[in-house]
Amino acid sequence: MPELPEIETIKRGLTSLIINQKVNKAILHRENLRWVIPKHLSTTLTNQLISTIDRRGKYLLIKFKVGTLIIHLGMSGSIKVVNTNTPLLKHEHFELQLKNGTSMRLKDPRRFGAVLFSKDGSHKLLDSLGVEPLKTSFYDGYLYQKSRNKQQNIKAFIMDNKIVVGVGNIYACESLFMAGINPKLKAGSISKTRYNVLTQCIKNILTQAIEAGGTTLQDFVQVNGNPGYFTQNLSVYGCKNKKCYRCKGIIIKFVQNQRSTFYCKKCQT
């Protein structure tokens, strides 16, 4: 699933390609993804200028004077910018054709994504989101404060989008490894000092992933079609039975909260 680094990568790519461009027409090649795509987009967005492109958690926000297009890539979605005359590919379900002769196309094979619209930029899906991990609201002490009396494991805790957004499974595994924290520990049992270390590790891992263009395991590609290169920097995720580069111990894989967890039993205590 595309997480914060992947959406940030797409946001930056789109900003350089489609900002200040006018929409020729919005085309719904399918009526729905996870939810129904608003039919009025085909008329509402015609001749509208793309003013800014933002990100909130895993949501891409494309802003116009008349409102905000809210896009979520679901489990397998991707966005590309191509020449408008490029043949439509299978699973490309939504398209913004621009007056400069290019098109922004959303591909979503599993159809767990979403294309929504808000006149004022607000939406119930955005209202419950936690803090952004790369902003000052994610400060030393924040995770410690939120974790008091929490019985859930630390990995599930930092993946909770109501606490902090965008720390997906890959980045949770990598951050906990860098911080030397066992993913099985209860969130409420970890000291403030260790949480402060983890906070910095989350920031560092996400920043590195963004600089590498995200992580491609299966479906994710950047807007230019290139894969994300953070895959080459993974220390534990996908490294079952390989040697830990720090201690030469063996990386372990187990299922935790219905997700694969990778960690070094020796390094992470």
Swiss-Prot record:
SUPFAM superfamilies: Glucocorticoid receptor-like (DNA-binding domain), N-terminal domain of MutM-like DNA repair proteins, S13-like H2TH domain. Pfam families: Fapy_DNA_glyco, H2TH, zf-FPG_IleRS. PANTHER family: FORMAMIDOPYRIMIDINE-DNA GLYCOSYLASE. Its cofactor is Zn(2+). Keywords: DNA damage, DNA repair, DNA-binding, Glycosidase, Hydrolase, Lyase, Metal-binding, Multifunctional enzyme, Zinc, Zinc-finger. Involved in base excision repair of DNA damaged by oxidation or by mutagenic agents. Acts as a DNA glycosylase that recognizes and removes damaged bases. Has a preference for oxidized purines, such as 7,8-dihydro-8-oxoguanine (8-oxoG). Has AP (apurinic/apyrimidinic) lyase activity and introduces nicks in the DNA strand. Cleaves the DNA backbone by beta-delta elimination to generate a single-strand break at the site of the removed base with both 3'- and 5'-phosphates. DNA binds at H91, R110, K150. Belongs to the FPG family. Monomer. A zinc finger (FPG-type) spans 235-269. GO terms for molecular function: 8-oxo-7,8-dihydroguanine DNA N-glycosylase activity; class I DNA-(apurinic or apyrimidinic site) endonuclease activity; damaged DNA binding; zinc ion binding. Binds 1 zinc ion per subunit. InterPro entries: DNA_glyclase/AP_lyase_DNA-bd, DNA_glyclase_Znf_dom_DNA_BS, Formamido-pyr_DNA_Glyclase, FPG_cat, MutM-like_N-ter, Ribosomal_uS13-like_H2TH, Znf_DNA_glyclase/AP_lyase, Znf_FPG/IleRS. This is Formamidopyrimidine-DNA glycosylase. Gene3D superfamilies: 1.10.8.50, MutM-like, N-terminal (3.20.190.10). Its EC number is 3.2.2.23, 4.2.99.18. The keyword Lyase applies. GO terms for biological process: base-excision repair. It catalyses: Hydrolysis of DNA containing ring-opened 7-methylguanine residues, releasing 2,6-diamino-4-hydroxy-5-(N-methyl)formamidopyrimidine; 2'-deoxyribonucleotide-(2'-deoxyribose 5'-phosphate)-2'-deoxyribonucleotide-DNA = a 3'-end 2'-deoxyribonucleotide-(2,3-dehydro-2,3-deoxyribose 5'-phosphate)-DNA + a 5'-end 5'-phospho-2'-deoxyribonucleoside-DNA + H(+). The active site is at P2 (schiff-base intermediate with dna), E3 (proton donor), K58 (proton donor), R259 (proton donor).
